Amino acid sequence: MWPFGKSTADRVKDAFKANPVLAPLGLEVQESRGTVKVTGEVARQSQIGLINAVAGGINGVKNIDVSGVTVLQQASAPAAQTAPTTPAQTSPSVQDSPSTPVQMPDIVQQGAGDVEIEDTSRIAKAVLSAIRGNGELANNPIDVLQSGNSVILRGAVDSDHELRLAEQLARGVQGVSGVDISGLRVAQGAKELAKDKDEDTGDTVYTVKPGDSLSKIAEHYYGDQMEYKKIAHYNNISNPDLIQPGQKLRIPG
């Protein structure tokens, strides 16, 4: 369960799938030490900017590498249309006009809505920046996704007060028309739980402490003790009662 059981790469993938332009592209995502590497193909150059904007709204993303993304169709100027030919009318009193060509401005051909979607997706990054700049919320695991001019907050906070604060900050960002906090939950100790990350993979890793049990750990991360089976299976633990202090467990999504 996000935010504790999903790697940074998986959360970036989820954000891409939630975007109507990027969802059909099937982009691949890898992450190491905060750098997200995206590979795949896009139709237009403008979608590279959209990738950066969407990934930039994900908590834990420090850098975005799009060198592995290929643009299939480069932006180009459309061919000039030829004016229909009409019979020339001669008049001895009118001089011929000069044949100097008129310099026309360059026209960049883009799909309808590409620029608007890219620009509005940048709102999510601005909201995340506002949350990161707040002393109470800076270390909370919160992702910001974009839906039109509205933002969707996903993750966890320590209290109802922080939940209201996150919504208030998001609404205060210029361009935000609505805030969805249905994916933002209150989880005691959210800040501490979010620190349990593998720096190389972004996976959640928990170090077993004296007195811990798998059911207690499952309650901590999932809010359900019976989810201990998921943790046991993911870590190849045959006997759930035999875990040792200092043992590191990966927490599956």
Curated annotation (Swiss-Prot):
Residues 4-73, 119-188 form the BON domain. Residues 204-251 form the LysM domain. InterPro entries: BON_dom, Lipoprotein_DolP, LysM_dom, LysM_dom_sf, Transpt-assoc_nodulatn_dom_bac. Residues 79-105 are annotated as: Disordered. Residues 79-93 have a biased composition (Low complexity). Pfam families: BON, LysM. This is Uncharacterized protein DR_0888. It comes from Deinococcus radiodurans (strain ATCC 13939 / DSM 20539 / JCM 16871 / CCUG 27074 / LMG 4051 / NBRC 15346 / NCIMB 9279 / VKM B-1422 / R1). The lineage of its organism: Bacteria, Thermotogati, Deinococcota, Deinococci, Deinococcales.
